[in-house]
């Protein structure tokens, strides 16, 4: 492994689950939860995500620290912050750079995930939150993930990167960035 590859492989930070939410239907309001079951190839219980191994967007994650960044880019005051449910992601994580999870598997609570790509903003966010939202969220929208091992996720659970296994016959999916 080159020195650069070693730097990419070493993720010493651990994250923490700060918020959990599901959408029972596509345009429904987010439901905030204290715990949720992540189901292999199906996403989160109660979320409208399409089941199946080919769905690369079973679970969406955003970085807690980016909520303030998006709020600032939208010109919001501290008294009117962007809330987790505003950006409609399932899990809000603090303490770890979600971009360091690219091409990696990671554990949250009992569940194991793999990153499948960046979670880009959509036109619906612009309609819901107002003009400029699309540009404010670009680069701060988080990641998409697929559930590899089912398990329960709770508020305050730890987010840990799984060690790289160079002998893995099924390496994590490679993303186009």
Task: Describe the function of each predicted region.
Residues 1-177:
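Metal-cofactor-dependent catalytic cores
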């Amino acid at each position: 492994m080159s020195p650069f590859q070693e730097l990419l492989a070493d993720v010493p930070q651990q994250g923490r689950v700060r918020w959990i939410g599901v959408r029972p239907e596509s345009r429904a309001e987010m439901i905030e939860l204290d715990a949720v079951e992540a189901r292999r190839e199906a996403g989160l219980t109660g979320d409208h995500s399409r089941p199946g191994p080919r769905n690369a967007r079973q679970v969406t994650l955003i970085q807690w620290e980016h909520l303030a960044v998006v709020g600032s880019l939208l010109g919001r005051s501290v008294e009117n912050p962007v809330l987790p449910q505003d950006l409609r992601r399932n899990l809000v994580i603090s303490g770890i750079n979600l971009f360091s999870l690219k091409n990696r598997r990671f554990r949250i609570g009992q569940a194991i995930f793999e990153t499948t790509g960046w979670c880009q903003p959509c036109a619906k966010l612009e309609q819901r939150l107002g003009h400029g939202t699309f540009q404010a969220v670009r680069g701060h929208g988080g990641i998409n993930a697929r559930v590899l091992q089912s398990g329960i996720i709770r508020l305050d659970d730890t987010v840990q990167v799984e060690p790289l296994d160079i002998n893995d016959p099924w390496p994590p999916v490679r993303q186009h960035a």
